[in-house]
């Protein structure tokens, strides 16, 4: 999962700090 900042736009989820 993403550790850090997680931005949730209208449809997609973008993890700025994605650490498996």
Curated annotation (Swiss-Prot):
Q: Describe PTMs of this protein.
A: N-glycosylated.
The residues the entry assigns to the signal sequence are: none
Main subcellular localisation? secreted
**Which tissues does the record link to its expression?**
Expressed in chorionic epithelium (trophectoderm).
What is this protein identified as? Pregnancy-associated glycoprotein 73B
In the record, the note on similarity to other proteins reads: Belongs to the peptidase A1 family.
A single BP term in Gene Ontology: proteolysis
Q: What is the lineage of its organism?
A: Eukaryota, Metazoa, Chordata, Craniata, Vertebrata
Give the Gene Ontology MF terms in alphabetical order. Answer: aspartic-type endopeptidase activity
Q: Does the keyword Amino-acid biosynthesis apply?
A: no
Query: What enzyme category does the UniProt record give?
Result: hydrolase
Q: What is its EC number?
A: 3.4.23.-
> What keywords were assigned to this record?
Aspartyl protease, Glycoprotein, Hydrolase, Protease, Secreted
GO cellular component assignments: extracellular region
Location comes to: Secreted, Extracellular space
